[in-house]
Amino acid sequence: MSMSGLPFDDFRALLRELPGPDTHALVAAKERNAQLTKPAGSLGRLEEIAMWLAAWSGRSPAVTRPLVAIFAGNHGVTRHGVTPYPTSVTQQMVENFAAGGAAINQICVANDLGLKIFDLALDYPTGDITCEPALSERDCAATMAFGMEAIAGGTDLLCVGEMGIGNTTIAAAINLALYGGTAEEWTGPGTGSEGEVMARKIAAVKAAVEFHKDHLSDPLEIMRRLGGREIAAIAGAILAARVQRIPVLIDGYVATAAAALLKAANSSALDHCLIGHVSGEPGHLAAVEKLGKTPLLALGMRLGEGTGAALAAGIVKAAAACHSGMATFEAAGVDTRISPRTEH
């Protein structure tokens, strides 16, 4: 994407002109679904998922190159003691991902998913959102553009996740700015905050939204002021996937906050996305409901790292396999449902 005018201008234009679903592919998928050897609707959400795949990929439902993209960033707000872990853990976990030692690695192996890790200037934490913007408009736009590169090399199902010590504080601030309520409602334990650490976390969320209160009517301004590099990169990846007709699975609380900024800018911006799971982070269910989405899984997980989306990818793959691999009534020689008799 070439930047012209103000850094956000190209993204604003893109958000105004998002492509819609492929109605021809959707109709074809519905016609085939009606002929498969099962009672109508008996596969429940698997059938809905298959239709969603068709509509947003523009082809018969298939998942052959699924990818998990994890974006890692560090946050200046951690100087306020909002988390029990040091920011060095972000880099250490990136190295753990690369070595294959994290939970996401095992889930990717189990579900046969590709995995890419994006290190977003970990040595340079974002600004402290309680007293300054996290990013300049230029840096935020550049990070969104970088996130768009997640789909380079090809994928037909993108799972977005993150790693970043302090980023549930960021997500809570974004949700408070978007939806109102109280900092307490949106702020959860994250990596295990409790007691005084939780009190500092809530105070930081309150202070951040109060400091930036005159600039929160524009979702992209919320992103740069209260967000982080992984937030911007996830938003960019979701946008790029929309343009390239790649369905998206969104992970947990932090990834959902990034996605919510896009929906605030364009109410249809997440139509090509599903929420992989509802996390154990207390504010996530409320955030998902604000998006009008129903998560695929509810396993009490709150790890992040794309794990919930990666688990849900197995369900999406199964939905595509059922749609493409099942026999039709005619091909299998199975009788269809008897039509009700008409009284004469």
Curated annotation (Swiss-Prot):
Record EC number: 2.4.2.21
Which EC class is the enzyme in?
A: transferase
Q: Which domain of life is it from?
A: Bacteria
Q: In which pathway does it act?
A: Nucleoside biosynthesis; alpha-ribazole biosynthesis; alpha-ribazole from 5,6-dimethylbenzimidazole: step 1/2
Could you tell me which InterPro entries the record lists for this protein? Nict_dMeBzImd_PRibTrfase, Nict_dMeBzImd_PRibTrfase_bact, Nict_dMeBzImd_PRibTrfase_N, Nict_dMeBzImd_PRibTrfase_sf
Catalyzes what? 5,6-dimethylbenzimidazole + nicotinate beta-D-ribonucleotide = alpha-ribazole 5'-phosphate + nicotinate + H(+)
Asked if the Swiss-Prot or TrEMBL record annotates the protein with the keyword Glycosyltransferase, the reply is yes
Q: Where do the catalytic residues lie?
A: E305 (proton acceptor)
Q: Where are the transmembrane segments?
A: none
Q: Which UniProt keywords apply?
A: Cobalamin biosynthesis, Glycosyltransferase, Transferase
Name any one GO molecular function: nicotinate-nucleotide-dimethylbenzimidazole phosphoribosyltransferase activity
- BP-aspect Gene Ontology terms: cobalamin biosynthetic process
Q: Which CDD domains match?
A: DMB-PRT_CobT
**What family does this belong to?**
Belongs to the CobT family.
Looking up PANTHER family in the UniProt record yields:
NICOTINATE-NUCLEOTIDE--DIMETHYLBENZIMIDAZOLE PHOSPHORIBOSYLTRANSFERASE (PTHR43463:SF1)
Q: What does this protein do?
A: Catalyzes the synthesis of alpha-ribazole-5'-phosphate from nicotinate mononucleotide (NAMN) and 5,6-dimethylbenzimidazole (DMB).
| Protein's UniProt name | Nicotinate-nucleotide--dimethylbenzimidazole phosphoribosyltransferase
The root-end lineage is: Bacteria, Pseudomonadati, Pseudomonadota, Alphaproteobacteria, Hyphomicrobiales
